[in-house]
Amino acid sequence: MGKTNKNRIKTGISYRSLHLLISANETVKEKREAEQLPALDNDTQCLMSTGKVHILNADYSRYGVSVYDKLYGYSSSAASTIEEEDKGSGDGFKKRYMSLMQGSSQWKSRKLKQKKNAPKASAKAKAFLVRLHSEKRRHEVDFADINCLPEEIICRIIANLNDADSQRNCLLVSQEWSECAKRIIYKDVKFTSTYRVGQFVTTLRENPQYGKYVESLDLSQLKNGFINDESSTLENDVSQSSYGFEPPDIAYAGWRDWRYRKNSLYGSEMLSSIHRSRTRRSSDASSMNSSVFSHNYNRTRSSSVTSLVSRSTQTAAGSKNVVKRIRKLFSNSFRGKGQQKTHLHQNNGSGLSTLELKDEQFAAGTDSCSLRRSHLPFTNKFFLKYAHLRDLPLGYIIHLLTLCVNLKSINLSNLSLSPDFEIEELEYKRNGYVSFFPEETEEENLNGLNTFNGDRELTPKFFSDSDKPYHYYKDTQYESIIWKLDSSRDNNMFTNRRRSRKKFQLKILTNDDLCEAILSLKHMKHLNVGNVVWLMQRDMKRLIVHSMESCIIEDRCLDKIYMNFEGSGLQTNLPLAGQGLLKAMVLLQVITDMTNNCSDDQILEWFELRWIPTFRRVSQPADLVYLARACDQLHYVIQSEESPTYTRVGEVLITESHTGHYKYEISRNVNNVYLTIQIENGKPDTITDVKLKECSDRLLERVSNLRKNQLLQHTGENFFSTAGLA
């Protein structure tokens, strides 16, 4: 019974419900049997009526079968007949209710078969994913992803972070966020190290699409390679006396280190200034000649066999330590590739490795904490003499201005330029018919079109892009089989000499190339080139006039461009060395030319100051109005590739201000293409107005002096003519 009770508990249907089902089935069977059984005799009926009849027949099927026999199939004649009937019939009792009982053997065997034939977990997972992404579920709307946002919104989110580290972390979110983060990071570019400028130029040359993201370029905050803050105050003293200057023991890398990064001598990390010991030099010349052999390098950072052997023999020659060091050297040289890679990775990183920190403790006047925080590499020992400079080659700046086509703001203040050359590769071609001695002509090959060479390396466009010396491009010649007869012995075939043909030609870069690169920018709104020596007054004039002409042609307002040339030029207080809107700079240019570059005759003619004898009273111009009609005599030439154009000044009107403030306006007549300038001379409000008022006051003073001289020269004639008529 314990087993039966357990089985009853395990069933999904209660015992009472089963009993009701079975009793209902029994009643139906009794009715069917009662109809089929024959009629009993009288004796049998009497016995049954008394209630003392005992039925001895073993066939109890007519009275029904117990639930226990039905479920567990006891061997009896009635049970066997019922089982046979159930097997024969399609919906027998046992077949219908056996699946509800978990304790039966059939249930266990069926479960084992299902478990054996069931798919594995991976197959179930795949089937679940297939059902999940089936067509029936495709009509369901998925949740929106962060990558589904428009690019403008993502860029606005990244721009509002206001943290450079957080903006750089957005590069790792996804591909969409990486592209938007690049636009924000490259939008405003500022540099404090010339080494980073060289890296940036190389990056833009390899990936020109990044240059389109740059809108602002600031090179005014470049610093020298000195590590100590105290040395920055001595920069002027160092630049003045270069012969008595002793380079520091350690300095940060500059653009020269980036240029020669692949050079075996200048790019070697073994010769970095961080590995130098504090040995005292006698002079700069002796240190430069014998620096490779006199200074001790860092032993842990060295990977050269010869350097280690030479050092070990010098320091401990004849001792047992030499053998140990050589053994250690060869054991390190035959180390596995994985270990070598990790060792090189530690040494070649932009920051300092743990091995470098040992040399920081004896670096001259440096703090180990400050060096550890620095991400800049250290300069080569041969470049220590350039540590006090913060210059940039002219080719780097032209690269930046050429690749960053969407620049709106340029700041080149406080910038020193290093001379540079443009590399032109010459090609020779034959003109006319083919002969033994054809004529040869040279043609230039623009390397800017072919950025990469056959080895997938950047083709140097300027001399600062290459790590080769100057004489390589000066002396390299083509290998040619063309020979040319000597002019002195034309008939002697043995006197033929080979004509040398240069492969490269170096063209020096000037300020004109820089101005052309600046003027090629179509979206420039702010130009700051203040406190520089290399910007001449003619360069200022060219930038002002060309910018004005481009604005007039494109129908743009002159108030949208701001220029600053304050403190620039070789001379102090240059007239054009000012700052202000383009409209103010154009006005400053015109007034300066009229004051300094025009003769007295031109001024007299423009302002109509010449005396003309008449028989009427001469009406002199009022003191408050000065009108100059320059017409074709005052014009500005703008050189272009097709033909030069002229910007002419038609009228210059100077009056006293009615409001008391200094105002000016420049307009251009579309019909005669003349500039009309109107000036209201009053109290200046800005620095630009102060300089404009000074120039206009000088012009008015000159005009008034010329008018007085004209009146003094013709005083008698005017008095005679007017008195006679009176």
UniProtKB/Swiss-Prot annotation:
Residues 143-194 form the F-box domain. Residues 284-295 have a biased composition (Low complexity). Residues 276-295 are annotated as: Disordered. Keywords: Ubl conjugation pathway. InterPro entries: F-box-like_dom_sf (IPR036047). F-box protein probably involved in ubiquitin conjugation pathway. This is F-box protein COS111.
